[in-house]
């Protein structure tokens, strides 16, 4: 009887310690990301766009944890990098698959140079691993089978506009190769209505959700879930200068600026895919 009681108490103690440890780990995960999001070191213009980009909700939907190995595709000026790099710095790994160093495109060179400067000078970026990515030509974004998560934000239209379907498909195949079995691909993209012509994807900067899902499936991914976190019902996706008519680009300048500011940033699909086990 006494032994049974001791065993029961021991089991209860183990269960309590396990629960406490799990709760503490969960809290650490949340606080690491929350700290990165709320940091005063974030660029003020970047933080102001949270109302349209919903980073906390988006990363939660994808299942992001600061212990993961995460690859961000084409981080550009580092809008999401300001969140991901510090959140992953202590316990995880962050690969920034940036523009190729041998690119002849001036914008790519300037963007890469600016990002490298951040990595060199900003302590928050000190653990960032920079790799190269371009559809078809530069696809080694991380060691094969090493990543828990690949993230791409508003990029698919660029690959499609630049190299048509083959370019976009090569990107998804690179993501698949980098991920571990069971790994997650998190994707956000400007959304074109399904009834619109496929040709509109070549110039508008918007993509059909069904088309993007099909590309991912062709590369081997399974669609896990979709979310309306980044939806904007005010966006009709039929603007004179495509998606760039809207904020933050406002390609028309002062012409109808108030109208487009009232619409806000684009309507976006938010998709979570999995590499099968």
Q: PLM features: residue spans?
A:
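A short acidic, Gly/Pro-enriched loop at the edge of an enzyme's catalytic core
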Residues: 139-151
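Conserved beta-strand signature within the Rossmann-like core of class I S-adenosyl-L-methionine
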Residues: 182-190
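C-terminal lobe and adjacent flexible extensions of AdoMet/dcAdoMet transferase-like proteins
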Residues: 219, 258-277
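N-terminal signal peptide c-region/cleavage motif recognized by signal peptidases
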Residues: 21-23
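A short glycine-rich, Lys/Arg-flanked "PGG" loop and its adjoining helix->strand segment in the class I
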Residues: 85-86, 166-181
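S-adenosyl-L-methionine
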Residues: 108-139
């Amino acid at each position: 009887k006494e032994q049974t009681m001791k065993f029961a108490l021991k089991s209860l103690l183990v269960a309590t310690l396990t629960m406490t440890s799990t709760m503490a780990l969960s809290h650490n995960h949340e606080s690491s990301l929350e700290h990165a999001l709320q940091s005063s070191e974030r660029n003020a213009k970047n933080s102001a766009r949270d109302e349209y980009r919903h980073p906390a909700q988006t990363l939660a939907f994808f299942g992001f944890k600061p212990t993961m190995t995460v690859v961000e595709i084409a981080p550009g000026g580092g809008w999401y990098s300001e969140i991901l790099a510090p959140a992953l710095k202590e316990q995880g790994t962050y690969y920034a698959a940036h523009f190729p160093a041998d690119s002849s495109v001036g914008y790519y060179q300037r963007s890469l140079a600016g990002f490298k400067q951040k990595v060199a000078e900003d302590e928050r970026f000190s653990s960032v691993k920079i790799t190269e990515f371009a559809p078809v030509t530069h696809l080694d974004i991380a060691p094969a089978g090493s990543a828990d998560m690949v993230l791409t934000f508003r990029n698919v239209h660029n690959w499609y506009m630049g190299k048509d379907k083959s370019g976009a498909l090569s990107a998804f195949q690179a993501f698949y190769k980098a991920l571990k079995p069971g790994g997650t691909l998190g994707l956000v993209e400007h959304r074109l209505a399904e009834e619109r012509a496929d040709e509109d994807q070549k110039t508008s900067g918007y993509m059909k959700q069904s088309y993007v899902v099909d590309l991912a499936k062709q590369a081997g991914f399974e669609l896990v879930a979709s979310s309306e976190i980044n939806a904007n019902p005010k966006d009709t996706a039929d603007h004179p200068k495509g998606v760039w008519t809207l904020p933050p680009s406002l390609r028309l300048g002062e012409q109808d600026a108030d109208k487009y500011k009232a619409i806000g940033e684009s309507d976006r699909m938010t998709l979570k895919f999995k590499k099968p086990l």
